[in-house]
A protein has these predicted regions:
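Sec-dependent signal peptide recognition
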Residues: 2-9
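C-terminal motif of bacterial Sec signal peptides marking the signal peptidase cleavage site
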Residues: 15-18
Length: 273
């Protein structure tokens, strides 16, 4: 009888331990599942060239960032706004997209440049595009997009796009999310600050002011902006507001100049006094 009681006691203890272990495992699994995926950044790149004819060689280079932790489709579509038709945002999916994009580019140049190919002198054409993560602070992620190309003519062309994404709200940040300042007043500040950051352009007489190369009477307050702890910056590509010789132009607007118009949530997240 005593042996029977002992066996039952041991069996009960083992059953209790197994049950407890199962509960602990379930709690651990639940805790692990509730942890958000760590924010990481990777990249994919394709660089290749093709000899279209004896007179023409074309090169293709493109780099895309990869964000494994980002799952929101609308946010991802906005991040890859220059790359239409992406269905798979994984590293393998983006690599495959770039390979397809490269092949389409080579094919289009071959089909669209038959008249030029018959020319008598050789040239090298190219197209480049790059995504670069500039910063990710206070859940505001700033990505800079650069493209450049040459397909005949006097010189190559290039341009920039700046985009800031609110990772808390899964959306691209708009100017209205930062300031309520009327557009006309903001544009007057841009005109006033046009020479704050020198473009580096010079001629025989020395440095040339940005304002001396303006092609517009009003500098538009566009969505091509980014910011840091001191300023809001507007970035303009060649020909957008100035002559090509001026290059790209960056115009800062200080938080002090925007005082009284800053969005409360933005101001708190950026810790602007």
């Amino acid at each position: 009888m005593k042996n029977t009681i002992a066996v039952l006691a041991v069996s009960s203890l083992l059953a209790f331990s197994a049950c407890k272990k199962t509960e602990n495992t379930a709690v651990a699994d639940k805790t692990e599942a509730s942890q958000p995926e760590k924010f990481t950044v990777d990249s994919v790149k394709v660089s290749d060239s093709s000899k279209i004819a004896d007179s023409l060689t074309v090169s293709f280079t493109s780099k895309l960032l990869v964000f494994p932790a980002l799952k929101d489709r609308k946010l991802l579509d906005s991040i890859y706004f220059q790359n239409k038709g992406i269905k798979d945002f994984s590293k393998n999916g983006l690599q495959a997209y770039l390979e397809s994009d490269k092949n389409k580019y080579f094919k289009s140049v071959k089909n669209d440049s038959k008249d030029w190919i018959s020319g008598s002198y050789a040239q090298d054409w190219y197209t480049n595009s790059h995504m670069n993560l500039v910063s990710n602070e206070n859940d505001y992620m700033h990505i800079s997009y650069l493209w450049s190309s040459y397909e005949g003519g006097a010189h190559d062309n290039y341009g920039f796009s700046e985009r800031v994404f609110d990772l808390k709200k899964n959306k691209k940040l708009e100017l209205k999310d930062i300031t309520s300042m009327p557009k006309a007043k903001l544009e007057s500040i841009l005109m006033k600050n046009i020479n704050t950051i020198h473009s580096g352009t010079s001629d025989n007489g020395g440095d040339v002011k940005n304002s001396d190369m303006l092609l517009v009477e009003v500098i538009p307050a566009t969505d091509n902006f980014y910011f840091d702890q001191k300023n809001l910056y507007f970035h303009y590509s060649p020909y957008e507001i100035t002559a090509f010789a001026a290059g790209d132009i960056v115009i800062p607007v200080s938080w002090e100049e925007l005082k009284g118009t800053l969005n409360t949530e933005f101001k708190e997240r950026m810790k602007i006094k």
